[in-house]
Amino acid sequence: MFEAKKSAKATLRMIKISPRKLNLITGLIRNLKVSDAIMQLKFSKKRAAVDVKKCLQSAIANAENNDGLDIDNLVVLKAIVGKGSVMKRLVPRARGKAFRIKKFFSNLYITVSEIK
C-alpha cells in the first residue's frame, strides 16, 4: 500500500488484556498516519487504547532518535497482536469446589515507517 523506506519498531509484552480485545484497538490504527493514529487512540474509550498509544509513542521515539526519520511522514505499517502467556487461577465455589479461570496476556508489536 505504502512504499516504505525505513522503519522502526516497538514492542510491548505481557499486557494484561486478552488478544481479542487488543486486536479491536489495533485495527483502528493500521495503515494510518501517526498523528491520526494518536488522535484515534486519544479519544477511544477502550482500556487497551492506553497501552497501544504508549507502544506507538515508543515506536515514534525509536524512529526519531535511532533512525533519524521525519515524524510528519510516519505511517503505522504493522500493528500485530500476539498471544502472551496465560495465568491460571482458582475461584472458590459452593460445596468446597474450586473452578479454574484463565487470565490472558498479550504481546503487541508496532512497526512505523516513513513514506514519500
From Swiss-Prot:
Function: This protein binds specifically to 23S rRNA; its binding is stimulated by other ribosomal proteins, e.g. L4, L17, and L20. It is important during the early stages of 50S assembly. It makes multiple contacts with different domains of the 23S rRNA in the assembled 50S subunit and ribosome.
MF annotations from Gene Ontology: rRNA binding; structural constituent of ribosome
Family of the protein in this entry: Belongs to the universal ribosomal protein uL22 family.
Keyword tags: Ribonucleoprotein, Ribosomal protein, RNA-binding, rRNA-binding
This protein's GO CC annotations: cytosolic large ribosomal subunit
Family matches, as SUPFAM superfamilies: Ribosomal protein L22 (SSF54843)
Superkingdom of this protein's organism: Bacteria
Subunit structure as annotated in this protein's UniProt entry: Part of the 50S ribosomal subunit.
BP GO annotations: translation
Coiled coil: none
InterPro entries: Ribosomal_uL22, Ribosomal_uL22_bac/chlpt-type, Ribosomal_uL22_bac/org-type, Ribosomal_uL22_CS, Ribosomal_uL22_sf
PANTHER family from the UniProt entry: CHLOROPLAST 50S RIBOSOMAL PROTEIN L22-RELATED, LARGE RIBOSOMAL SUBUNIT PROTEIN UL22M
Name of this protein: Large ribosomal subunit protein uL22
